[in-house]
Amino acid sequence: MRLVVDANVIFSSIIKDSITRRLILFEDLRLFTPEYFYIELEKHIDLIQEKSKLDRNIVELLIDVIMSNIDVVPLDEYIQFVPEAYKIMKDIDEYDTAFLALAMSLKVDGIWSNDPDLSKQNKIKTYTTRELIKKFNI
């Protein structure tokens, strides 16, 4: 299954050893995220470290392991879908535009997000962590 994964799902997998982390490492999932993710990571890295209660070195190691299972896609590969995605997301949550645009460009099976705002759009199916757990019987 091919999914675009949103930043908060990735952050959750870094913060806590959980089912979310196991799903990210699950071989039946091919995951993608926009390069914009790294801007979000940089903004929130201190909070992620604080919530995880781990040393910075361990947090960075976890980021490397988790991101080795996620394809980071540069903006130029989905930029032509940004205007349409923005039209859809501008009144919902414009910060999710990149995730929707990427999903539209890659023609994935859906977007993995626990953010209710992303599920308000009807262009691309959105899966929560709970739905993926049920789907894969994990």
Regions found by a protein language model. Give the residues of each.
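Alpha-helix capping/helix-boundary segments
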Residues: 10, 37, 99, 117-118
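Active-site neighborhoods of divalent-metal-dependent phosphate/nucleic-acid chemistry enzymes
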Residues: 72-110
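Acidic, PIN/NYN-like endoribonuclease modules and their adjacent C-terminal/linker elements
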Residues: 104-138
